[in-house]
Swiss-Prot record:
It comes from the Bacteria. It is found in: Cytoplasm. Functions in the N-end rule pathway of protein degradation where it conjugates Leu from its aminoacyl-tRNA to the N-termini of proteins containing an N-terminal aspartate or glutamate. GO terms for biological process: ubiquitin-dependent protein catabolic process via the N-end rule pathway. It catalyses: N-terminal L-glutamyl-[protein] + L-leucyl-tRNA(Leu) = N-terminal L-leucyl-L-glutamyl-[protein] + tRNA(Leu) + H(+); N-terminal L-aspartyl-[protein] + L-leucyl-tRNA(Leu) = N-terminal L-leucyl-L-aspartyl-[protein] + tRNA(Leu) + H(+). The lineage of its organism: Bacteria, Pseudomonadati, Pseudomonadota, Betaproteobacteria, Burkholderiales. It holds the Pfam family ATE_N. The keyword Acyltransferase applies. GO terms for cellular component: cytoplasm. This is Aspartate/glutamate leucyltransferase. NCBIfam families: PRK01305.1-1, PRK01305.1-3, PRK01305.2-3.
Length: 255
């Protein structure tokens, strides 16, 4: 069930926000459709909302609802058919030694400092590079659904033993994992932490016998979001139906 009217969510209400500056496409205005009240959105309800194209930021559950733009397309990797590209295999080999620790959503000062470093280097001037601790916690550590925090560190035998390299927030859904947000050490120029994180989530979904990894929105015109098409096979939510990427976007995305 993908269409909102088909979902058993009669207790929820949905409203459209006022226009605001789009964070993905310069010069565009965006709007969101927000699901309320937040306390009714438990793990089961949220799983259904994600299948209908919603995402969350803290306890704020939304999906794009723009007046004249449909660039944001929900996407998910088909786990049991996933086949890594050559570049993805290299990323897996490069970072396979990282040790992953799965934990509840918890504030750790070291995580927060890495988050600030990541924002200042990768998204300078984007408005999040000076987030306070409260803003960080509201964005990433508040959740009413089945959420996990995963930290990735260098192994004991590494010259940088124990060094924190990456932190990822993940939601566990009925039919998959949903990648909420990931930040990593931006100083390592040759690293492929972001790619490795998606590969790790795909492997976890396979181990849990979950069919999908939801990657949020694919935006062809946005360099920050277009990379998701590199993880194939990918499905896109178009007009309420999940369809294969190649059926919607016939040309091949360059790696």
């Amino acid at each position: 069930m993908s269409k909102l009217k088909e979902l058993p969510l009669s207790a929820l209400q949905f409203y459209a926000t006022a226009p605001y500056a789009c964070s993905y496409l310069d010069g565009r205005l965006a709007r969101s459709q927000v699901a309320t009240p937040a306390h009714l959105i438990n793990a089961d309800v949220y799983s259904k909302l994600v299948r209908a194209g919603f995402r969350r930021s803290g306890i704020f559950t939304y999906r794009p609802h723009c007046d004249d733009c449909h660039a944001c397309t929900p996407c998910r990797v088909v786990v049991d058919q996933y086949s890594p590209s050559r570049a993805q295999r290299r990323a897996a080999e490069r970072h396979q030694g990282l040790e992953a620790l799965v934990a509840p959503l918890t504030y750790v000062e070291e995580h927060y400092q890495l988050y600030l470093l990541y924002q200042s280097v990768r998204h300078a001037g984007g408005g999040m590079d000076h987030d306070s601790r409260d803003q960080y916690e509201q964005f990433l550590l508040q959740s009413r659904v089945n959420s996990r925090l995963v930290e990735f560190r260098e192994p004991p035998e590494s010259p940088s033993a124990g060094k924190l390299r990456m932190v990822s927030m993940i939601d566990v859904l009925e039919d998959g994992l949903s990648s909420v947000y990931t930040f990593y050490d931006p100083i390592e120029q040759k690293a492929s932490y972001g790619t490795y994180n998606v590969l790790w989530q795909i492997a976890q979904a396979q181990a849990l016998d979950l069919p999908y990894v939801y990657l949020g929105y694919w935006i062809e015109q946005s360099r920050k979001m277009a990379y998701k098409a590199l993880f194939q096979p990918l499905e896109l939510l178009v007009n309420g139906e999940w369809r294969r990427f190649e059926d919607v976007v016939p040309r091949t995305t360059e790696e």
